[in-house]
From Swiss-Prot:
Superkingdom of origin organism: Eukaryota
Disulfide topology: C33-C57, C34-C73
Lineage: Eukaryota, Metazoa, Chordata, Craniata, Vertebrata
One Pfam family of this chain: IL8
Cleaved signal peptide residues: 1-23
Cell location: Secreted
Gene3D superfamilies: 2.40.50.40
Keyword set includes Transferase: no
InterPro entries per the UniProt record, alphabetical: Chemokine_b/g/d, Chemokine_CC_CS, Chemokine_IL8-like_dom, Interleukin_8-like_sf
Keywords for the protein's UniProt record, in alphabetical order: Chemotaxis, Cytokine, Disulfide bond, Inflammatory response, Secreted, Signal
Main location (coarse class): secreted
Protein name, UniProt field: C-C motif chemokine 26
One term under GO cellular component: extracellular space
Family: Belongs to the intercrine beta (chemokine CC) family.
Amino acid sequence: MKSFPVAFLVLLIFILSVHRGVTTRGSDVAKFCCFQYSHKILPWKWIQSYKFTRSSCSQQAVIFTTKKGHKVCAQPKEKWVQRYIALLREQQQS
């Protein structure tokens, strides 16, 4: 019976880590879904890359990866998000 709280805690930690939007390498589609968006505009100098969430996710999102490796979910319709995506695409082409 004492192992149940530990197992529950491990499951909760796993679910929360999925929430952060961990992505797969070499793909433009994130491995997991976002459940909430960041409410702050990230400084451009922090941004390294981006990915889109899967179409099967309940909320469409863009997951930005910072230069420190943090994953941040953002609303795709936001103007700053669209601008950052365009800038990152330009960098990839040059």
